[in-house]
């Protein structure tokens, strides 16, 4: 009888261990539950679009008015710029040119800006810029060239430390048909 009692207790303990083991998953939970990030918070695209367009206009006004401080605020320190003539420049060169007023104009209109929001910290804007009565001094010369006309632009903005700034800019002149004004 003792053997039977020992066997019954052993079977009971074995059964309890098996039941407990069955309650705990031997397989890792599905990764789609464990690895899925929480739903992203909604990006306020309207606010980003408004801020980027505001900065775009401030930048044009800064160049037009010779306001180097305003241009400094809009441009990131590491901005990469492709100018309408295909040359490249950096922030320091642009700020120096603005301070020296190497470019003058009656107006610089930003038309048809279209902002594409990539995420909460990155966006780009495309559009047209129209410069009226624009003149640019030729470096190392007393000559000026007429820069009046219509341009297409692509400017990339990034929010860093809570502040939006232009990190890349590219401007292309649009050829005008003879006798047409922008």
Residue ranges and their predicted role:
Residues 1-10:
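Bacterial N-terminal signal peptides that target proteins for export
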Residues 2, 23-24:
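N-terminal acidic, proline/glycine-rich, low-complexity intrinsically disordered segments
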């Amino acid at each position: 009888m003792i053997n039977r009692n020992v066997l019954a207790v052993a079977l009971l303990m074995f059964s309890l261990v098996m039941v407990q083991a069955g309650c705990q998953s031997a397989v890792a939970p599905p990764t789609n539950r464990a690895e899925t990030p929480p739903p992203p918070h909604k990006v306020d695209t309207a606010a980003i679009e408004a801020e980027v367009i505001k900065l775009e206009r401030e930048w044009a006004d800064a160049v037009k008015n010779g306001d180097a401080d305003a241009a400094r605020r809009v441009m990131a320190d590491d901005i990469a710029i492709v100018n309408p003539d295909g040359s490249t420049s950096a922030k320091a060169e642009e700020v120096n040119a603005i301070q020296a007023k190497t470019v003058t104009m009656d107006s610089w209109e930003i038309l048809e800006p279209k902002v594409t929001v990539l995420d909460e910290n990155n966006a780009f804007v495309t559009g047209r810029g129209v410069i009226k009565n624009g003149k640019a001094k030729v470096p190392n010369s007393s000559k000026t060239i007429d820069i009046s006309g219509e341009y297409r632009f692509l400017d990339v903005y990034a929010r860093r430390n809570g502040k939006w700034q232009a990190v890349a800019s590219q401007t292309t002149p649009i050829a005008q048909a003879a006798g047409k004004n922008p």
